[in-house]
A protein has these predicted regions:
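Short polar catalytic/cofactor-binding loops
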Residues: 2-7
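Short, solvent-exposed loop/turn segments at secondary-structure junctions
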Residues: 85, 125-126
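A short helix->loop->beta-strand "cap" motif at the edges of active sites that frequently abuts
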Residues: 104-115
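Internal, well-ordered alpha-helical segments in soluble enzyme and binding-protein domains
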Residues: 98, 102, 143-146
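Short beta-alpha junction loops
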Residues: 119-124
Length: 147
């Protein structure tokens, strides 16, 4: 689970795990309102750790407690905002194995669970802290293209 939300549509349920600031945008409420507009009842549970990486969530026992807390139909994972924009070798070594671990675990807990990946966001002015070493992230457009 990544800084996360858990959403459910009865009798189905969904869990969103994310590592970014989406918690400030009240995504669970937006999801509930959208489902309600279609006559669906929803259940929302959250786990948010702003700025946490996939590796953090894969190593956090609470991630697995949340996944085990219900028969989720969907487990939605979102990487920390910079994480997928880093060089491919770094993403392949430091992000994807943990994303796979979380997705595989969701499916092992319930064979009906489907892991979905929710695109993270590029920073308005790019990633200035990493710009010198990875120029592709110097601007929003450059960072967004990598995401």
């Amino acid at each position: 689970m990544i800084s996360s939300y858990t959403f459910g549509i009865y009798p189905r349920s969904e869990e969103l795990i994310e590592a970014t600031r989406k918690n400030t945008e009240n995504l669970p409420s937006l999801f509930q309102n959208m489902a309600a507009s279609k006559g669906k009842s929803t259940f929302v549970d959250t786990k948010t750790n702003g700025g946490a990486t996939m590796q953090f969530h894969a190593n956090d026992p609470l991630s697995y407690q949340k996944m085990n807390s219900s028969d989720w139909n969907y487990v939605v994972l979102q990487a920390q905002s910079q994480e997928p924009s880093f060089p491919y070798g770094q993403v392949n070594a430091q992000t994807l194995p943990y994303a796979d671990q979380l997705a595989d675990t969701a499916n092992q807990i319930s064979s009906c669970s489907q892991a979905l990946f929710f695109m993270t966001w590029g920073r308005e002015n790019g990633d200035q802290n990493n710009c010198e070493n990875w120029p592709s992230v110097c601007t929003y457009d450059g960072m967004d293209d990598l995401l």
